[in-house]
Structure formats: C-alpha cells, structure tokens
Amino acid sequence: MKYLFRGGTVVSGRGTRRADILVEGEKILEVGRNITRKADQIIDVTGMLLMPGFIDAHTHFDLDVCNTTTADNFTTGSRAALRGGTTTVVDFACPNKGESLHHGLELWHRKADGRTCCDYGFHMTIDDWNPQIEAEIDDMYAAGISSFKMYMTYPAMMNGDNAMYHALKKLKEKGGICGVHCEHSGVIDALIEEKKAAGEMGVSSHPRTRPDFLEAEAVSRLLRIAEAVDIPVVIVHLTNAAALREVEAARKRGQKVYAETCPQYLLLDDSVYDNPDYSLAARYVCAPPIRKAEDQKALWMALRRGEIQTISTDHCSFTLAQKDAGRGDFTKIPGGLPGVETRGELIYTAGVTTRKISLATMCRVLAENPAKLYGMFPRKGILQAGADADIVVYDPLADHVIRAADTVANVDYNPYEGFTTRGSIQQVWLRGRLAVEHGTVLAGPDGKYILRGKNCL
C-alpha cells in the first residue's frame, strides 16, 4: 500500500516546511511539495504537524525493583508509548550482580519479544566489573547494543570509581556510549540514617536526603573519570542547575558530554512532596527527586541553548497500592513515575507554545538526537526518503485534558492529572501502519527489535 499524507507541515530538527509525505510499505518514499506520484490512499493532514515518531531512550518496563515489579510490562508500556507518539523505546536490560550480560540480554528478550507494540532496543546495564563482564562487551555490540548504563548509587547496582574507569576504557575501544545515574551514594545513605534517627521518615524527607549538590558532585566526579579515559558520556535524567554547571564546565575543558532530562523535572517542583496526603505525595517519589522551580528554568534555558540533547521519561510505573509500601518509611516507596503516554503533548504545551523552545528543538530532543546518539539515525528520528515511516500527526489546536481514567498504561494515577495540553496527537504511524487513531491504540505486539549502531551525534 502507498499512502500520501497531503497538506501538512513537516517538522525536523532544522525547522518546518509545508510538504507531502509518500509512504510505501514500511518506508518513506518521498517528502516534498505537491507530490504527484500515485497512492492507494490520500490522507488529508491539512493544518497538522507531521513529526518523526518520538524515541524514548529511557524506560523501565517489567523491572523487578523494591520487592515488586513495575506496573507496566512491555505490552502495556509500549501501548502507552505509542499513544503518546513514541514509536521506539530503548529499555534497560538489567542483570543482577553476579549474572552475565548474556543472561540479562536473554531475559530482556524474553520479556519483550512478541510482546512489544512499538519498536524497541536495549541498553545494557553494567552493575559489576570483572573479566567475564569485560569479555562479554564485544558480544553486546554484535547483538545490536551500542549503549550501556552504570549507577553511582543503589548498592545492588552501583559501580565504584575504579570499576567505572575500567568499564569506560573498554567501551571506548568500540565507540560505545555510556549513560550514568549520578548521585553520591555514601552521603545519601548518611542523610537517610540521620532522618531515621530523628524519626523523620515521611515523604517530605525524600528530597532532603537526595539534595541537588549530591547529584552535582557525582556528575563532576564522573566527568573527571571520563576525562581521564577520553570518552563521551551521557548524564541521564539531569535535574538541576548545579549539575548542569558541572556539564558546562566539562564542555569548556573540551570534553564531549551529552545530557538528558525528563518532563517531571521540567513541569513539576518539589512542593509535591509536602502534601500531607501520603498518597498524593508518594506518587511523585523518584530518584533523583523532583527539584525546585528555579531548576526548571535552568533546564528550559539549557534546552533552548542546545546544552541538553534529549528529553526521555525514565518511565518506571507503579500503582498507588505499590507506592503504599512506604508508609512510615519513605525509603521503601518504589521510586518512579509513568510518563511515556504524555511526554509529547506536555513538551509541546509547556515548551513550544510558551516559546521556551522551538518546534525544531522539540523534534531534536524527542526524535532526532536520540536516534543519532543511540545509533538509529537515519532509519529513525527524521522524515525523509528511506527512513522508517514512523509519523506523528499532531493537531496544534485540539486541546486535551490529561486524566488517569483515560490512560492505557497499567497505572491508576497520572502525575499530570488535570493538565490541559495545547494540541493533541491525532494519529501515530509505525513503519507505515496506522498504530494509533484519536487515542485508540490499534497496533498489536509486533514491534521490531532494532539493531543499533554507533553514536553519530
């Protein structure tokens, strides 16, 4: 089948232009004004924005954590992603300490293959470093994994500085990229012990035990290690101005550093933790925690200046019943928020319509840059001949109110409940097939695993 999208405005990382898009099978054949080649079906998209399918390079589906499992598996999570305009996710394969990378990869394929409705790939988590893990790294590249993750916090997952140095040296050999969760674990643990001794174990203590300067310190330490190795790294879910200053300082030294942030750090502030209603406060517990309003401003300015390259979600969803496990002890609240279903509309509303960022910037941080950074460009992330026909049809005038009752994710709340978005996703096409129409997910669990190459950003 050939489809001709006629009369829309095509968005790219360079700007916008009025153009038609001709699609055949899974691929885009042509993008241009007044395409005359015949099509089996003409789709009138007059007045619509046509954006490349969004890429969420930071999700946690079907993850065992805090003695429970995330509410969204690969089926429900990918359905929610598609509804939000995301046609590709890159999830984290997470072997436990003592397990091989091969075991982690096989486990995540069992979780995702034949169950995922959008296209998908995996980052590989390195939570240990030894000769076996080092020997397996080359096999990961052969399996289509070109990006990795390490933690500077969480004892069950973290690496010390020595291990991080040696792991980064190994990744440098083949041009791999590594994202790092940056928080100072030792001081966080000390602050938690102080709160326990004081009997202050309510939700409001969560952000006070993970302050911004402990994130900034870890960012600084990571970047000095990366400088010693001479390798670019990704600061995942960067939340605040202090951490951002460390990134800027490294760039001034000549380092190549990439930064990611998330909608919760752009739209919410830490007052959410002060709500006396436990349920209303606990739902926002995540790590790093949501920061202050002035940090929001710094992040938006960094996006505008091109200092933050991607906006992902860190989608890690739990039900309110799961969140209830931390009553009386905030450290037992499973940390994470849902986000894949609302990211595009929120960023358009809070960023583009307020002129904090341009439409081209939105396209770069949601689609083009993650495609380049994680080795999927130009197959993904751009609307041009030869690319996958992943298309988001966005009506900039159709307002939408976010409500948990309407969600397709497997959660019973939404962090952005009651937010009115300006504009709405009307259709989502995945490799030339209509996957979502007017909020209804049509796609089945036939997403493709994407073999990814090297970073080209």
Model segments located where?
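Histidine-rich, glycine-flanked metal-binding segment
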Residues: M1-G53
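C-terminal cap of metal-dependent C-N hydrolases
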Residues: G8, A325-D329, A385-L451
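Divalent metal-coordination and catalytic microenvironments
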Residues: G8, I21, E26, G47, ...
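Metal-associated gating/positioning segment near the N- to mid-region
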Residues: V45-R115, Q132
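Short, surface-exposed connector motifs at secondary-structure boundaries
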Residues: T86-V90, T116-G121, S146-S147, I225-V233, ...
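Alpha-helix-loop-beta-strand connector modules within alpha/beta enzyme cores
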Residues: H102-C118, H166-V180
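Histidine/acidic residue-rich metal-binding segments in metalloenzymes
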Residues: Q132-I311
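His/Asp/Glu-enriched, well-ordered alpha-helical/loop segment
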Residues: V203-D230, Y284, R304-R305, Q309-I311, ...
